Structures are given as C-alpha cells and as structure tokens.
Amino acid sequence: MSFPYFISPEQAMRERSELARKGIARGKSVVALAFAGGVLFVAENPSRSLQKISELYDRVGFAAAGKFNEFDNLRRGGIQFADTRGYAYDRRDVTGRQLANVYAQTLGTIFTEQAKPYEVELCVAEVAHYGESKAPELYRITYDGSIADEPHFVVMGGTTEPITTALKNTYTENADLPDALGIAVEALRAGSAENSSNDQPVLGVASLEAAILDANKPRRAFRRLTRSTLETLLQERDSKESAESEEPKESEEGKKTGKKSDADSSD
C-alpha cells in the first residue's frame, strides 16, 4: 500500500521562501534613498524599455527587483488602485503607506495560497505634498508580504550585503542630488564588483536607470533622470569633491609660507 506524499507546512513555507529568495537574488540590484529634495531611485538596468522604477501616483513612486512580469503586474495593479481611489475620494487620500499595505496583503495572499510565490521585492516611497515639511517615507515589501518602514534607504535584489555596507558607511542625511546619486552609484558598484570578475568593466551610466520624487514640484513629483543628466550630476559631484580636497592643501601651503615670512622678518 502506497501512502500519499506528505510535506509539513513549515517545510512548504521554507521551500517557498528559498525559491523566492533565489529568484530575487538573480535580479539586478536597486537602491532607493532619501535626500534633501525627496527620494532618489537608482537601478542597475541596461534595458531601455523594461523599467524597474515607476510612478504610482502624484507623490508616490515604485521600484522593484526580481521577475519583471510579476512586479510589472503589481505595478499596474497599484496604479489602477491609486487612480480609482483618487477619483472616488480625493487625491490626497492616496498615500504611500496605503499602497504599501495593499501590496503586502496581495503578496502575503499569493505566498500562502498559490502554488508558487512571487519572486519579487518592492519599494514604495512617498514625499510630502508641496509646501509641507515632512520627511520622505520608504517602505520595503518582501515576497511573503512582510512590510518594513525604512528611515533612510532601501536595497533590493542581487547582492545586497556589500551595497548595504557601502551605504551605511557613506550615506549622509539631507545630501543634495549630485551627492546622493554618487553615494548610490558607488554602492551599486560595490555590489557589482562582488559578483564580477576583474576584467569586467565598472558599472557605468549606460547600465543605470534612475528617477526622483521631487518634493519641490507642486503636483506630480516623479521625474526620470536621463543618462546625460546622470553624467552631468556625477561630474558635478566629482568636481566638488576635487575642489574640497584642494582646499586643505592650499591652507597648509599658506601656513608654511606664513611661517617662512615670520622667520625672514626676524632675521
């Protein structure tokens, strides 16, 4: 007599979690961080048509890592939910926390009830309405419906440990856009260097997708950053850093010349 195959619920959840984590880890990394002017999204994405970063509503943005078809379905569902609620009630009734909760409930239901979980990790971010002085809100939603409120930055997909470590060492609150972009790009390069060989080129602007939620814009805060804009911002940061590094040298030279002149006057 053959017995039916049995698997405990705990083992089933472990296997689903492992499947989802492996699928997310195969994807490219995404970083979202708060800066002085709002929220910056930067994703490692060489494709020009398949986008990981999107607008959900007036002041709310979206970024994802994992399987594109799965998180794109979630993105479109979030846009439809936000549009319907904003039309039925008021545009200010659509918030990032509300959309993050909807995504958490959806992913939690899929994880427990469907045969296969979604291999995705999401970030929902919101900036304050124009004229309000409220800090940006960042929410991370994982494959099993878990939701977390992150105060400064979110790292998803790929190899997250070196990127998170780099951000912990370099992130500064209220940085301007060039500095924030430089911090995010350097962190992503740390993650790509962990996975690549020595002969592979450094992660460049051509392989990046970026956008911001601009808190200083009156209504729709979402704005994509073109690759030419990224190059300009990174060059601006490099020139500022080089200027700052030259200032201490000039002050030291001034002190040395001052000492020499004092010695000459005593003679």
UniProtKB/Swiss-Prot annotation:
Composition skew (Basic and acidic residues), residue ranges: 234-267
Presence of keyword Cytoplasm: yes
Compartment(s) of residence: Cytoplasm
Taxonomy of the source species: Bacteria, Bacillati, Actinomycetota, Actinomycetes, Mycobacteriales
Pfam families registered for this protein in UniProt: Proteasome
Species of provenance: Mycobacterium marinum (strain ATCC BAA-535 / M)
Protein name: Proteasome subunit alpha
Similarity section: Belongs to the peptidase T1A family.
UniProt subunit comment: The 20S proteasome core is composed of 14 alpha and 14 beta subunits that assemble into four stacked heptameric rings, resulting in a barrel-shaped structure. The two inner rings, each composed of seven catalytic beta subunits, are sandwiched by two outer rings, each composed of seven alpha subunits. The catalytic chamber with the active sites is on the inside of the barrel. Has a gated structure, the ends of the cylinder being occluded by the N-termini of the alpha-subunits. Is capped by the proteasome-associated ATPase, ARC.
Ranges in coiled-coil conformation: none
